Amino acid sequence: MSLVPTPQTDTGDCSEPTPLRRQPTQRRSARRVERMLDACADLLDEIGYEALSTTRIADRAGVAIGSVYQFFPDKRAITQEVTRRNVEQFVSRVGARFLEEDYRGWWEAVDAIIDEYVDMHRTVPGFKSLHFGDVVDLNLLDSDSDNNTVIAGRLRGLLLKEYGLADSHELDVAVLVAVEAGDAVLKLAFRRDPDGDTEIISAAKQLIRGFLPRQLSPFRG
C-alpha cells in the first residue's frame, strides 16, 4: 500500500532522477510521451511486465520505435515513469479529498488514503499491475530505499505537519510497519476479488487503526 500526504505536506519527490532520457519541450512531444505511458499501462494489465516490450508499446501508442528510444532507454524506464505518474496522481487525488473533506483525526485521513488506493487499483490502467512499482522492482522509486519506505516517508510527512506529532526514529519505524502491514492485507483483498474484497479492505483499515494509536501516542507534540 502506498500512503502519501497532500501536495502541501509533501516531503519531496522520489529522489531517483527521472527515467526520461530528455524532457519533451514541445506540446506535441509531451502528448506523444503521454501516449507511450498510456500504452504501457494498458499493456501491463493485458499481458504483464515480462511480455511487455518497447516494440509493443510503440505499436499501441501509434509512434515509431525511434520515438520511444528518443525518450526512454528500455521498458523498465517507461514502467518507472508510469509508476511516478501514478504516485503524482495519487498525491493529487488525496490532496483534493483533503481539501474537500474534514477529518476528526489522522485515522480518518488514513481511511481516505486507503479508499483512494483502492479506487485507483480498480480504475487506473496499469495500477493493479504495478501498485507503486513493487511488482517490477522493489527499488523502482528510489535506488537506495525500497518503494514502501519511500511511501512511508510521505505518510510520515503528513503526520508531522498535519497532526502535531513529534519527529523521531520510532515514528519512522511505526509508520513503515503500518504501511507494510496495510500493503500486505490490501494485496490479499485484491487476490481474493479483482475489485477488492470489501471485508478484507475494512480489515486493513482496522489493522492500521489498531496499531498506530498505540505507537504514535508517545510522539504527540
Language-model region placement:
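Solvent-exposed, amphipathic alpha-helical segments
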Residues: 39-47, 89, 93-100, 181-189
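Hydrophobic alpha-helical connector segments
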Residues: 81, 95-122, 178
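N-terminal intrinsically disordered/low-complexity leader segments
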Residues: 1-31, 216-221
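An amphipathic alpha-helix signature
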Residues: 37, 107, 111, 115, ...
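Short secondary-structure transition hinges
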Residues: 107-112, 123-153
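Generic hydrophobic, amphipathic alpha-helix propensity
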Residues: 32-40, 57, 78, 82-90
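Helix-turn-helix
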Residues: 35, 43-77
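Hydrophobic/aromatic-rich alpha-helical bundle segments in the mid-to-C-terminal region
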Residues: 129-133, 141, 161-208, 219-221
